[in-house]
A protein has these predicted regions:
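Adenosine-nucleotide cofactor-binding segment
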Residues: 138, 142-171
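Donor/substrate-binding cores of folate-linked one-carbon enzymes
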Residues: 129-130, 151, 155-158, 175-293
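Short beta-strand/turn micro-motifs composed of small residues
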Residues: 10, 100, 127-128
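A conserved regulatory-domain signal marking ACT and ACT-like small-molecule sensing domains
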Residues: 1-94
Length: 293
């Protein structure tokens, strides 16, 4: 069975859905899942489809030919619709690289979820500016790379070199970089190179409590809700398109340490859920917002 995910954006117009479905049918595919949304303010149309076709035999060359043919047919059928973006994605296990610093909760959770098959991904490697997480990562037989950060420019060059070497070794391109509590600020050049391909998680106290100890600040203010935000990374610090958020109610019984532990739990859950959405090609980015199916 040959299966593709189609991600289509365009200026909303009459006849758009009909043109898409007719093209898919003419190419011999069956639509097994369809989600669509129109932003009424922007007049922007979003559509995600899962389509299938019986084909034998199936090899890499045939899959690539079919992908090109389908994309060409869609662009031709929709050429009169404006602001058009079309993604034709062959369903496959995505290749990801994890970046971390010292904290283990998000990294360990992702390692377990990938190992257990909950996340359809292959972890090419883990990069960290500390050695402390090496024993954890190597328990999963995943390569661990230490990239010290005495100078941020040199550190980024080393990270990029590691990524390139991993891609060459596996003969693939990394689909996604996941910052599992990677506590470094990435440069504009780095984020542009991987636009909408870097996933980050942070506590949702920003921007109210900025600094090294947000939970202490939140405790002193007596906050009643803690949470986490998963987003794509762009050149603006913690301001990229938001993919997923969640919160947890707390009360006066929560100490700073209890808040911190609860915060870790919600961070790893939100990151894992957001990563699953991205791996399944459910996230559309338009301007600085997302549509998630």
């Amino acid at each position: 069975m040959l299966e593709f995910i189609l991600k289509i954006q365009a200026r909303d117009s009459k006849g758009l859905v009909s043109a898409i479905s007719t093209t898919i049918a003419n190419k011999g595919y069956n639509i097994v899942k369809n989600d669509e949304f129109v932003d009424p303010l922007k007049q922007r149309f979003f559509m995600r489809l899962k389509i299938q076709k019986e084909m034998k035999p199936l090899n890499t060359e045939i899959k690539e030919q079919e992908e090109r043919s389908l994309k060409t047919a869609l662009f031709k059928a929709l050429e009169n619709f404006s602001e058009l973006l079309i993604g034709v994605i062959l369903t496959h296990k995505k290749n990801i690289i994890l970046l971390a610093t010292k904290e283990s909760h998000c990294l360990g959770d992702l390692l377990l979820r990938v190992y257990g098959g909950e996340l359809n991904a292959q972890i090419l490697g883990v990069i960290s500016n500390y050695e402390i997480l090496r024993p954890l990562v190597e328990k999963f037989d995943i390569p661990y790379f230490y990239a010290p950060c005495v100078d941020q420019i040199l550190h980024e060059k080393e990270v990029l070199a590691i990524i390139k070497n991993l891609e060459l070794k596996h003969k693939v391109s990394a689909d996604l970089l996941v910052l599992a509590k990677y506590m470094r600020i990435l440069s504009h050049d780095f984020t542009k190179r991987y636009e909408n391909q870097i996933l980050n998680i942070h506590h949702s106290f920003l921007p109210a409590f900025i600094g090294a100890n947000p939970y202490q600040q939140a405790f002193e203010r007596g906050v009643k809700v803690i949470g986490a935000t998963a987003h794509f990374v762009n050149e603006s610090l913690d301001a990229g398109p938001i993919i997923l958020q969640d919160t947890l109610p707390i009360n006066h019984n929560y100490s700073v340490e209890k808040m911190r532990l609860a915060g870790k739990d919600i961070e790893k859950l939100v990151l894992a859920r957001a990563l699953k959405l991205v791996l399944e090609d459910r996230v559309f980015v338009h301007e600085n917002k997302t549509v998630v199916f």
